[in-house]
A protein has these predicted regions:
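Metalloprotease/metallohydrolase-associated module, dominated by Zn2+-dependent proteases
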Residues: 2-68, 85-135
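Active-site recognition of the HExxH zinc-binding catalytic motif
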Residues: 72-84
Length: 135
């Protein structure tokens, strides 16, 4: 079990692992933020990826969301971080988002599948965590 995780089944941690597998050279910082600015049309924004001039990437996820919605918004923003600011919501971004979804589900299967004996302690789970420096 990963002793660094507060929730042993954290979907945010699982998404982080998926992102690092798909985009190992891209670094980001993420925050929950209650006051994300509205978009240019005055519409509420639930997530934001900021690409600073110095190359730093910061992701913000609105705190008003359910966990399920926040995870989806986080994945959406991670896709932006993975493909870069110039991609917007084009095919390259969509592929990154879909790949994150697939990798996230693969990680879930590795970590929690009944085919792993016992669950939570499977070899693939331990290897994934060790490769990422979590254990």
């Amino acid at each position: 079990m990963n002793s660094n995780w507060i929730f042993k089944n954290s979907p945010f941690e699982m998404l982080d692992i998926a992102f690092k597998r798909l985009f190992p050279d891209v670094k980001y910082t993420a925050y929950f933020e209650p006051n994300i600015r509205d978009d240019e049309h005055g519409e509420k924004v639930y997530g934001l990826t900021d690409f600073a001039d110095d190359g730093e990437i910061t992701i913000f996820v609105n705190t008003d969301l359910s966990i399920n919605d926040a995870v989806e918004i986080f994945a959406h923003e991670l896709a932006h971080a993975g493909v870069g600011v110039e991609q917007e919501h084009n095919e390259k971004w969509q592929k990154a988002f879909d790949d994150l979804f697939d990798e996230y589900n693969k990680i879930g299967d590795e970590m929690f599948s009944s085919n792993v004996n016992p669950p939570y302690e499977g070899k693939a789970y331990k290897e994934a965590l060790e490769q990422l420096g979590y254990e």
